Amino acid sequence: EYITAEAVKDAGYDDLEAAKEDGTAFVFMGHGTSHTAKVSYSQMQAQMNDLGYDNVFIGTVEGEPEETACEAVIEAVKEAGYKKVVLRPLMVVAGDHANNDMAGDDEDSWKSQFEASGAFDSVDCQIAGLGEIADIQQIYVDHTAAAIAEVGGEETTEVASEEETTEAITEASSEEETTEAASEEETTEAATEKKTLN
């Protein structure tokens, strides 16, 4: 829900239904895998269908499982009758796969393949990773807090606030910089001592 809501908003629609009425389909491109975990992509598509998100399609760069391959997704969107397509990465970070495999100008990019099919009036790309969505960030924070509590042997239902999390990250970064600076200083001192001894 968070993922689709963000894509819909970024495309300028009030909701998924308004996009559907305008003939717009959203295609989320994940990585894919040959591992048995690939079933999660099929399950995600089934979940979208169950939610009534008829204009949401799940694909993968690796094309595994098969129904998530670019050609299969193009066919599914075409058969569903949508004329506008919005491509968006289903990845935490919008890196090489998003910029090149999805939105690149090469003929094998998803954007190029959708355009080359001749079935769509427009193909737009949203270059934004899941990690940019506040609600997804909170899921990571919650899971991290739960893992820390489990490792610490404590059970807690209280989750750090966004402010506390930001403070902790800032402190950790400062400590890391201080450690790195100290380490560099020690290395310089050791080199100076070595020169002095020689």
Question: What do these predicted regions represent?
Answer:
Residues 1-155:
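Extended amphipathic ligand-handling, pore-lining, and cofactor/metal-binding catalytic surfaces
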Residues 156-196:
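Intrinsically disordered, low-complexity serine/threonine-rich repeat tracts
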Residues 33, 196-197:
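Small/flexible residues
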